[in-house]
């Protein structure tokens, strides 16, 4: 059996359910054994009743996990005193688990109100000792749903429940008049059985469910057109909060299922549905529908070549893992000899990009992980290599599960991780007219410390001199580092004990203000040295703890003109590593592959097509009438780009039909002009409610991971006043 959610309530007849499906574009079979409708009228009553005492979000977030294919019921118990009266009148229904002394008293045909032993037994008696599972007015909605998903009968002391009908344990006269019996559609009279769920192939209900992979939501639903406000509220929250784990099913695919046809699938999601249902399928091939987030990668085999006195020798054989084929083709890498250093000893840009995009190196002799020494001074340095081959070609998904919503990205890398160099390389990359990662889209946690007077690193330096009892920075370095530049554990521990309050009391307050300000100015990439920096600053973006295949401490030692010198930076590096959480790092390449590879893939698909029909933007829309009230010219509506999209024309046409307007924000259009062309003013965006789920943008389309918020001005008129507006997302393209 499968469950399909459709946002409407009809009578509990298969013919009505079939008509409902057809109204949403589904060609349904006329066999009533195929389709069964679950009447969820009573759930609407429960929702309305529950919202008086619980947060709407808590109730909806719980109900979305209800397994509607599991038969269950709440059994409403009378108040304890009335329950005992019922037992006294009907001794045969007293449960076996009741204390035998209490059972014996209840079977006596006399007035027990003045029986001291009976009253003592009553006071000791707990409903939870006899009836399990038991929910009450203090039970959370999620616990209620978990209970009815796992049991056929859940006992309750309250009628304020959600997700299943209520069956009366006793005749109605035993219940308090204060209990609400206005919920007639929820209450099953005493002695009447619950109608069983039919054994149809498809059960149609009102509310989406995440309880099982076989629970689907019809994708052709227009949320804004749902007439019932409670159902509309439910769908709006589920679509915004749980969008990435909902199982959408298209009318065409459901039609094929109902008509018992071989399924025609055209996307990874549809293929997944066919596999879940164990149904045969064939893939509809289309050049326009290519999953650009599935990327070909290989392992690059190379040898470290040493040349001495004209003689060539191989000192080490390495494997560079999980390198994108598209980047290898972009660089033009072949089986040949390469010098990977510039004249100044630094790595070439292409080698740095290649290694950063990888999942590290393996020494083929020891089969252990190998870290590259950034120094150009022997021993154990790499200057010349010979690429000997490519192996283990495979396909990987570069869209991580954690990137569920379109939000800023916090990238945590240790000091000495070549951030400046790799950002310079990415700043120069442009694909399909879109810059991969403009430098203005990147902020660094160092900027927080540099805003302080004195700077954070200078303040730390002066305080550490006092802890070490020295006057100079050189003496401080000698005090904490040994001759081999490895810190003395006890002394480094003393410095760390003072580092924590400095980071908490000095750095964190400034950081909170900095990130609140910078993240309202754009969906930016933020670099930090420790994830604790961002966590303590209430950073709300995706947080990625990353690592690179280089010895970062050595890179620190060869960088000059840093605060306190390279040795003090080394000490700070040790402290930041201690400051970090215990979360396991992932390779920096996993983020870089997401930034670069889909765009290179898309370029192959649409590189020769007209840019006007393969380009689109999603942004915040402000009607020109609102702008004119604040002195703007009103030549056109205001539009602040949120996401830049490149995709084939047919994919853009599909994206155009999606419900973008369900996401809203407060947009502050400033009077601060950006230098250069085109003419733009800066804007700030504070998103209200939920961020846009990444799933809303098709896997057949590329979108910008970062964005600086600007409002474009197509005219030369004077600018207006800085003002705030309520705005919703709209889709904009040149398509007719």
UniProtKB/Swiss-Prot annotation:
Family stated for the protein in its record: Belongs to the orthoreovirus mu-2 protein family.
The protein's required cofactors: a divalent metal cation
Pfam families in the record: Reovirus_Mu2 (PF07781)
Subcellular location: Virion; Host cytoplasm, Host cytoskeleton
Name of the molecule in the record: Microtubule-associated protein mu-2
Cellular component, GO annotation: host cell cytoplasm; host cytoskeleton; viral capsid
BP GO terms, sorted: symbiont-mediated suppression of host JAK-STAT cascade via inhibition of host IRF9 activity; symbiont-mediated suppression of host type I interferon-mediated signaling pathway
The organism's place on the tree of life at top rank: Viruses
One GO MF term attached to the UniProt entry: structural molecule activity
Gene this protein is translated from: M1
Organism classification: Viruses, Riboviria, Orthornavirae, Duplornaviricota, Resentoviricetes
Species per Swiss-Prot/TrEMBL record: Reovirus type 2 (strain D5/Jones) (T2J)
Functional description taken from the UniProt entry: Minor inner capsid (core) component. Displays NTPase and RNA 5'-triphosphatase (RTPase) activities. ATP is the preferred substrate for hydrolysis. May function as a cofactor of polymerase lambda-3. Associates with microtubules and plays a role in the formation, structural organization and morphology of viral inclusions, where the assembly of cores and the replication of viral RNA occur. Together with mu-NS, recruits the other core proteins to these inclusions.
Record's subunit section: Interacts with protein mu-NS; in viral inclusions. Interacts with polymerase lambda-3; this interaction stimulates the ATPase activity of mu-2.
Keywords: Capsid protein, Host cytoplasm, Host cytoskeleton, Host-virus interaction, Inhibition of host innate immune response by virus, Inhibition of host interferon signaling pathway by virus, Inhibition of host IRF9 by virus, Interferon antiviral system evasion, Viral immunoevasion, Virion
Major location (coarse): virion
